[in-house]
């Protein structure tokens, strides 16, 4: 399964409803479940302490923003791109010094969250985790 890896690709005209990873994953409900689990893991598991320290104490805004990005990125409603014109995850994280270790924490927590989301299509879930891991590793600067 091929998923978009850039904001430019993801911002292209959406496909017909039901034909994109967003809909195949289960839509907003599944995307929000992934994001909530991701941030819960970051809050609860000491393995993600360095990653957690890079975020504000209140993760509510991040939960909403990441869910919006993942929805748009995976072929759902384009609201995140319309609300953040010209931005992508890479440009938004440029001010942060992200090590390979922190990128690894991010991708591990995200893959766990995807795995815990109860996605029926295991191949799609694995592909999503893999592409997001590549994106996270692409932000590392060491």
Residue ranges of each PLM-predicted region?
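Heme-based O2/NO sensor domains and their adjacent alpha-helical segments
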Residues: 5-19, 32-119, 128-129, 133-138
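Short, glycine/acidic-rich hinge or "gate" loops at secondary-structure transitions
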Residues: 124-126
């Amino acid at each position: 399964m091929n998923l978009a890896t850039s904001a430019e690709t993801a911002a292209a005209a959406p496909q017909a409803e039901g034909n994109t990873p967003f809909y195949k994953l289960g839509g907003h409900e599944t995307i929000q479940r992934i994001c909530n689990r991701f941030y819960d893991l970051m809050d609860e598991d000491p393995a993600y302490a360095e990653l957690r320290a890079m975020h504000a104490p209140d993760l509510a805004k991040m939960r909403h923003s990441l869910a919006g990005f993942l929805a748009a990125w995976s072929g759902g409603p384009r609201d995140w791109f319309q609300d953040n014109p010209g931005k992508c995850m890479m440009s938004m994280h440029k001010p942060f010094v992200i090590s390979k270790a922190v990128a690894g924490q991010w991708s591990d927590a995200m893959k766990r969250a995807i795995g815990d989301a109860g996605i029926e299509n295991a191949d799609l879930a694995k592909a999503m985790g893999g592409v997001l891991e590549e994106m996270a590793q692409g932000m590392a600067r060491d």
